[in-house]
């Protein structure tokens, strides 16, 4: 699963905003996405992905919200 799909999956399951650390941890715990080097997703990767998809995500008060 692509990282953006994993972020949406995690956020749909949780009603309300999440921090990038919470999202990265949930993706890792559920095994939804793994980097090419085998390491778990980082909060920086989550943040970069969210910035690439402003039509899907918004940032408010340090939390990421799903817009779709």
Where are these regions (language model features)?
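Short helix-capping/hinge SLiMs at alpha-helix to coil transitions
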Residues: 12-15
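Charged low-complexity interaction tracts in eukaryotic proteins
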Residues: 1-4, 18-21, 26-68
